C-alpha cells in the first residue's frame, strides 16, 4: 500500500496560509528596510502573494491562471533587492510564522525554500558594499 504524498498546501491549509501572509505584510509595512520598495497599500500585494504561495506550496494554480508564469526574478528586477532587504524579508516571514504557530518540519522546510527564493531575488549589493568593476 503506497502512501499519498503530503502536499504542503494541504498541511498548512488556506486559512493559516492567508493569516500568515496578512501578518507578514503587517510587518513589512513597518520595516524601514522594506517599506521603500513596497506600495503604501499592500492589499493587492498580499492578494497576489496568497495566490503565489498557494501555488508554491502545491495548491491550485491560481497565480498562474490570473497572472501567467510567476517569473519571480524578472518581476522583482524593478526593485532594488539587496542582501540586507532579503534578510529583512525573511525576518518578517519568520516572525509571522511564529505568530501563526507554524512549527516543526513543515516550518523548517518551508522556511528554507523561502531562504533560497529570497536569495535568488537579490539584484543589488547592500548600500555599504563596495561594487567591483
Language-model segments: which ranges?
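Core of compact, soluble alpha-helical bundle domains
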Residues: 1-133
